[in-house]
Amino acid sequence: MRTEQITAKALKQIGDDRYKLSLIVAKRAEALANGAQALIEGDTSKMKFADIALMEVAEGKIGLEAIVEGK
């Protein structure tokens, strides 16, 4: 799936708020960089942390609630 399609799907998951999406992706990418496990299936070893975070949001595996709670 192309990045534009993933982004559109992620935006739908969080109510079409680009600010919230950027906040979620940035915080989750930071957590992934610090050793958190990816919540998506498949080989993520060659993916950027931001791409993994975006896919997690698009698949509904993570949202703003998890970021606010500090998960």
Swiss-Prot record:
GO terms (BP aspect): DNA-templated transcription
EC identifiers of the protein: 2.7.7.6
Keyword list, A-Z: DNA-directed RNA polymerase, Nucleotidyltransferase, Transcription, Transferase
Domain of life: Bacteria
UniProt KW Glycosyltransferase keyword: no
Keyword Transferase found: yes
A single GO cellular-component term on record: DNA-directed RNA polymerase complex
Known catalytic reactions: RNA(n) + a ribonucleoside 5'-triphosphate = RNA(n+1) + diphosphate
GO molecular function: DNA binding; DNA-directed RNA polymerase activity
Residues spanning the membrane: none
Gene3D superfamilies cross-referenced by the UniProt entry: 3.90.940.10
Top-rank EC class of the record's enzyme: transferase
Protein function: Promotes RNA polymerase assembly. Latches the N- and C-terminal regions of the beta' subunit thereby facilitating its interaction with the beta and alpha subunits.
Self-association state and partner proteins as the record states: The RNAP catalytic core consists of 2 alpha, 1 beta, 1 beta' and 1 omega subunit. When a sigma factor is associated with the core the holoenzyme is formed, which can initiate transcription.
Family as reported in the entry's similarity comment: Belongs to the RNA polymerase subunit omega family.
NCBIfam families per UniProt: PRK00392.6-2
Name under which the protein is recorded: DNA-directed RNA polymerase subunit omega
Organism, as annotated: Campylobacter curvus (strain 525.92)
